[in-house]
Structures are given as structure tokens and as C-alpha cells.
């Protein structure tokens, strides 16, 4: 498994040299809101502020997509991912796709 400090939103890893680019990797998750969750979130909007039900749903979806991307990179033999990004698209009413993607690389520590 790829160590968390070996994932970067930039295209370099401080203290490391990229030896090989192994290709694009991604993790995709599709989530829907439950009826109960939608009602609870609707009640929270009345009072304003953070809608905690949606926040936790979004955090969980991003974490799951991230884990899938790391597994994809590990299958290619990567020990790092650079240029990592998230994207989200609403597919339908209450259904959202979360994509986590980046470039799988093999990097070595500078001596």
C-alpha cells in the first residue's frame, strides 16, 4: 500500500526523485442520499450553517474514492501518486459521483 505522505497534489515529492511514471490512476465512488438523511438535512437548512449530514457523506465518499485510487496505483507497482485531484458530479437527483485521480509514479528518496 502507498504511504499517505507519498501522495501529493503537486507534481513533485520533496526529497524524492520520480524514476518512472506508471500512468493515470483513479478511484470512483457513487453515493446517494437516503430519504431519512435528506429530511434531516432539510431540517438543518432551516437553521442555516453547516449541514453535517451532507458533510459526513461527502467526507466518506472522498475517503472511499481516495482509497480506491491508492489501490489502483498499488496494482501498477507505484509507491507514490502525484497531481492528485478530486472531482464530483451530480449524476441525478441525490446521486453524486466522486472521482479521485492522479499520476502513479515510482519515486526514490534523494540521498
Swiss-Prot record:
Pfam families: YbjQ_1. It comes from the Bacteria. It comes from Paraburkholderia phymatum (strain DSM 17167 / CIP 108236 / LMG 21445 / STM815) (Burkholderia phymatum). Belongs to the UPF0145 family. HAMAP family: UPF0145. SUPFAM superfamilies: YbjQ-like (SSF117782). This is UPF0145 protein Bphy_3680.
Amino acid at each position: 500500500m502507498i504511504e499517505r505522505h507519498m501522495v501529493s497534489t503537486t507534481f513533485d515529492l520533496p526529497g524524492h526523485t520520480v524514476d518512472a511514471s506508471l500512468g493515470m490512476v483513479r478511484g470512483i465512488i457513487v453515493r446517494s442520499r437516503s430519504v431519512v438523511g435528506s429530511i434531516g438535512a432539510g431540517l438543518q437548512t432551516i437553521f442555516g450553517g453547516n449541514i453535517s449530514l451532507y458533510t459526513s457523506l461527502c467526507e466518506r465518499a472522498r475517503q472511499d474514492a481516495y482509497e480506491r485510487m491508492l489501490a489502483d496505483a498499488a496494482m501498477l507497482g507505484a509507491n507514490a501518486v502525484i497531481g492528485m485531484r478530486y472531482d464530483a458530479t451530480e449524476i441525478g437527483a441525490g446521486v453524486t459521483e466522486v472521482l479521485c485521480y492522479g499520476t502513479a509514479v515510482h519515486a526514490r528518496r534523494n540521498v
